[in-house]
Amino acid sequence: DVLYTDEDKISEDSHDYKKPVFKPDYSPELLCANNYITHFFVAKKTIVDRGGGFRKEYDGSQDYDFIFRCVELAKKVGHVSKVLYHWRMHGGSVAGDPTSKMYAYDAGKKAIQSHYERVGIQANVEHMERLGLYHTEYKMIKQPLISVIIYGEDDEKKKRCSEWFKRKDYSNVDILASVGINVEEINALAEKARGSYLFFVSENLESVERDALQQMAGVLQIQNVGAVSGKVIGRK
């Protein structure tokens, strides 16, 4: 129904090709964080007729709003993993100077918020420090019990990890700890856990954002989402 391609940048004199963008296959979560699709974007006329064309109230990010409305109606979103679009850079373009159209980023935020409203997801969209990136705060429709299952062999580490979760913003938690890293034991803990959601974490986790559980629980309340994880950064 719709498809998009990879792209790069081209100099104003058409001599230099640089900054290729090799995009992933369709990711609705990534699209709500950044308009990674941009160019080329191709849609069936029937999709465009149903969803409508570009809208003036989204000037600066009218393509972002248009893409959202098209993918909402599409049964399949395709990705051609070849650089088929060359975005010309000049001083007045976003390609050459991201700060040249600051209003575009507010329009982008509005496009994401409107998408959430159309598909029935309760969320607030915020700007991130880097221009063109957005963060979604999912509203908690309810606060289900989350069973935090800490696995490992070091009692001190598990105790420290347990204390972190007791101090977090999300209070409806049930903390369970294994006596080792045996798969059967961890599965047994999961079976007897009382929570609607299970959060598996290693004793080696050294820090957790205050709202980590709330953020992930919010994502899990979205229809068709069955599992979620945050980014884990190791020392090596």
Predicted regions and their residues:
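Non-catalytic membrane-proximal stalk/linker segments that position and tether the catalytic domains
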Residues: 22, 92-164
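Short beta-strand-to-loop acidic/aromatic patch adjacent to the donor-nucleotide binding site
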Residues: 194-208
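Short, acidic, metal-binding catalytic loop of nucleotide-sugar glycosyltransferases
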Residues: 163-172
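Catalytic donor-sugar/metal-binding loop of nucleotide-sugar-dependent glycosyltransferases
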Residues: 58, 68-86, 113-125
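Conserved donor NDP-sugar-binding/catalytic core segment of glycosyltransferases
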Residues: 1-17, 205-236
